[in-house]
From Swiss-Prot:
Species this protein is from: Rattus norvegicus
Topology term for the membrane: Multi-pass membrane protein
The protein's name in its UniProt record: Glutamate receptor 4
Gene for this chain: Gria4
Positions of glycan attachment: N52, N56, N258, N371, N407, N414
Cytoplasmic side: 566-592, 612-617, 835-902
Amino acid sequence: MRIICRQIVLLFSGFWGLAMGAFPSSVQIGGLFIRNTDQEYTAFRLAIFLHNTSPNASEAPFNLVPHVDNIETANSFAVTNAFCSQYSRGVFAIFGLYDKRSVHTLTSFCSALHISLITPSFPTEGESQFVLQLRPSLRGALLSLLDHYEWNCFVFLYDTDRGYSILQAIMEKAGQNGWHVSAICVENFNDVSYRQLLEELDRRQEKKFVIDCEIERLQNILEQIVSVGKHVKGYHYIIANLGFKDISLERFIHGGANVTGFQLVDFNTPMVTKLMDRWKKLDQREYPGSETPPKYTSALTYDGVLVMAETFRSLRRQKIDISRRGNAGDCLANPAAPWGQGIDMERTLKQVRIQGLTGNVQFDHYGRRVNYTMDVFELKSTGPRKVGYWNDMDKLVLIQDMPTLGNDTAAIENRTVVVTTIMESPYVMYKKNHEMFEGNDKYEGYCVDLASEIAKHIGIKYKIAIVPDGKYGARDADTKIWNGMVGELVYGKAEIAIAPLTITLVREEVIDFSKPFMSLGISIMIKKPQKSKPGVFSFLDPLAYEIWMCIVFAYIGVSVVLFLVSRFSPYEWHTEEPEDGKEGPSDQPPNEFGIFNSLWFSLGAFMQQGCDISPRSLSGRIVGGVWWFFTLIIISSYTANLAAFLTVERMVSPIESAEDLAKQTEIAYGTLDSGSTKEFFRRSKIAVYEKMWTYMRSAEPSVFTRTTAEGVARVRKSKGKFAFLLESTMNEYTEQRKPCDTMKVGGNLDSKGYGVATPKGSSLGNAVNLAVLKLNEQGLLDKLKNKWWYDKGECGSGGGDSKDKTSALSLSNVAGVFYILVGGLGLAMLVALIEFCYKSRAEAKRMKLTFSEATRNKARLSITGSVGENGRVLTPDCPKAVHTGTAIRQSSGLAVIASDLP
């Protein structure tokens, strides 16, 4: 009964079709869409809408009525249900997308039921009669490009999502030409696997890659290439994809790697331009994916609708009756009941030839695209640029690369360049009232001024961007990912880095540096020790204690020698003239240079004072002369050194060099956690630095600091128990800032420079380098350093390298001299008292007085100068003046001089 009813319905539909000209006014078409194809669905809807609403004066219009299903390709039962649902609705053709899991199910149903499938998905490897491939094959174009580049050794990365057609073609060509191809399937790779693979290939010096993957996987691979820094100059990537402009390649632009690919859609054609105008007006909420330009798969989807519409027009012109398709049919019938007009539909589809968004759309008898043209693009500094095209007839044709470097520069001048830097005094700092400013005006510092000068010389606009992680740039040993400002350049987030960024080998491998704008080295910062207090006898410091001991021995020795030569020389002996009324000269001629007088003479000469006696003999005068010469040199040297020692404050530093740090354990030391200083110690082969690195790496708690400011703060708080290793420029700057409690010790451990960095191969590199050289020749770099280091210093002049400061003398500097003066005066008073007592005792015996009486008489005489009670003047027996006279006799060969002494 059901069969009879179905036949009646079909018969009625046939008569209705004949009455309406054998062609329905509404054509049922199907649509099968898989996950992540929102933009393709938008293009599908837009194409149908434009067809149904566009006037056509030459032919009677007909509407396309879509029946759309979203399929989950992982579930073959769901795919079958979706197709059967389309078939049961009486669709004349199906537009659908598939992947490797659903392709065989869909193509099998199409072949069995004679329902044509128009698809923008990857071409199938076998021959499917009722499948029309909108996507052209890349095999011929890719092989032509490999021949052009003359690659004979490269890596081929692929997945199985699109089959093995390109892999087979490349391996066949490799066998014919002797190519060495490393084919690697990356279907099951994750991010870590990608990075490990890329590092391994880099160790094998693999620099050329062909990547044949769908857009989602392709984009992930490119991100991992950037993350390990393989997107720089020296690498070449060919992307086996028809949407070169659909791929995000901004970071590769800055990296400098050569990237080549294919572009199916020419956005300069009138048809594409017109559609783009309409595309931009779509409501993004109603048409998801319309916020971005249509991908090549969306363009193929649009062309697929045009192909179906043109096919129905052709069928109507041929008066082929397709109205008997109806809305009945069981796709699971056994045996299968194919659609009777399916052959006519499939034949007419393959005969269609139109101009679509992807150029000429034409098929061979296998349903594959023929007579198509695809453009060849390369990535330039200004973005993707067409360098040629490929088609079946002409093969690869390269066109002249008209744009020049000047145009690249002009393009740079017309946009704002991102300048990455780091908050580090005095290079980049916030102004005190930075909240009142916007953009670059919020910052000040050496690098801010330098960026302004470089921009003036190059003629660019720029925007300062502070690096988010606050690091200079180092590569993680495990993930191989660069951080800091180097990472900003490597991964295309910035175009210039103007900061205290040290030029190193590992950085130079992934970015370009200008000539150094500042020279420096690694130095040691410690907390400034307390000023050493001068000792009581600091006046002795100008001469070593050994010298003082030698002077004492010399003094004694000279006195003894003078005594001896005076004893042996006859010219030192003389007689004294007797006073009137006295007896003649004594039998013992006097000699003035006894041991005490010799000591007194030597002391007077040393103190550069005089003496009331002088040598008479030649030998004595020789001794006196050499002693005077000796004292002249010693006193002059002492005086010269004394001025410096008493007027200069000295600070005793516990550390003076890296060797001092390495051989002690009391003072900890460390570096910045991510930077060239840490890398210097890690890579150093010098024994001292290796020992220091071993300590720093294993020290607990960690001696590495996140920022320079943190390291300086740690030095200040450690009470002299932490030393920070950093660039000398920062060390000198910090020494000039309050609270003025840090200092640089020792010399620089190495010699290096700061440079302005640009991405590898960037067109800005040469211009920046020339600007730095020009600024250096003009002396502006030195002016900037003086401005931010010393002119704005807060600790006074004197230079960062000086540890001594000249100051006025304090009492502590000369206290010892006063002590000696007071001690000498006290000693003199004591000796005078002893002499007073001794003489009083002698006078008491001589005058037959008591000791107390003699003492009183002596005291009265000392105080008042008056006579005593007995009328006699009590005076001490002072030596009388010596008067020389004539020799009156000779005894034992000695000339005796008359004297007045008894």
